[in-house]
Amino acid sequence: MLTLRRFLATLGPGTVWLTLFLVLPLLIVFVYSLLTRTDVGQVGLPFTLENWQRVFGYDALFEEFVPDNLQVLWRSVWVAGLATGLCVLLGYPLAFYIAAQSERRRRLLLLLLIIPFWTNFLIRIYAWIIILRPFGLFPSTLAVLLGMTYAYLPFFVLPVYASVEKVDWRLVEAAEDLGATPARAFWAAVVPQTLPGLVAGVILTFVPALGTFVVSDILGGAKTALVGNLVQNQFGQSGDWAYGSALSFLLLAVVLIGLWLYARAAGQRGLEDLA
């Protein structure tokens, strides 16, 4: 009885919150993906798998395969992955640079990093049109990539910076005393200590980049539509909520699989470093 009370007191509120605002909405969306769009544009019975067939490119009778959605999904994955990679290349050294500064300068740099959050997201993305148009880069996939990198770079830098501040630099000195080169000492002693922040930064960057539709809609145009644009269009202009729900679950599945693979690889890497 005491254990039940302790559970209700500690985990009960969080469990109720997650159930009401995460599990239940996802369940509703999944049920919508199995329903039929009516003649008046509503969602109703009977249950059907037609929406899922359309998601994977098949018609109702599995006679024709048109992988347009899968091509858009693949484009979304590699664009989001490339944007995340750019955030890693730019943000990882930046986090170390900020951590190496004096306290006063560090606060100033962190403030400059956070200031864009105080400006409306749409205004910041529209500003890139003014920057890129004179160079003939708007609209284009490159413009979308630059916009994503700009938008999500702070989400990568902040968790990595938090990990860098906790690095024990005595391990680097010990590695160098044992004959390791500076590069080898950094890779063996510093990178594993910043791995939690690196994983968190990649997740916080890749997930919103994969599902975004604002950046690609403004900077990319119709030729660079991503899966987020497809979902937004189904729930908006097209009004096909059943099909949009199926697309949403496909996007969710890809995100979860990607996060699982990355976490598994990062965890395996951490175990190898400890060994």
Where on the chain are the PLM-derived regions?
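Interhelical loop and adjacent transmembrane-helix boundary motif
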Residues: 4-6, 38, 51-61, 217-264
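C-terminal transmembrane helix and the adjacent membrane-cytosol boundary/short C-terminal tail
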Residues: 2, 9, 161-176, 188, ...
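Amphipathic cytosolic juxtamembrane alpha-helices at the membrane-cytosol interface
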Residues: 4-5, 78, 104-107, 141-143, ...
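Membrane-interfacial helix termini and adjacent extracytoplasmic/periplasmic loops
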Residues: 49, 122-149, 183, 219-223
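Short membrane-interfacial helix/loop motifs at transmembrane-helix boundaries
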Residues: 25-65, 131, 217, 221-222, ...
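Transmembrane alpha-helices
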Residues: 12-24, 115, 150-152, 156-169, ...
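N-terminal signal-anchor/first transmembrane alpha helix
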Residues: 1-29, 107
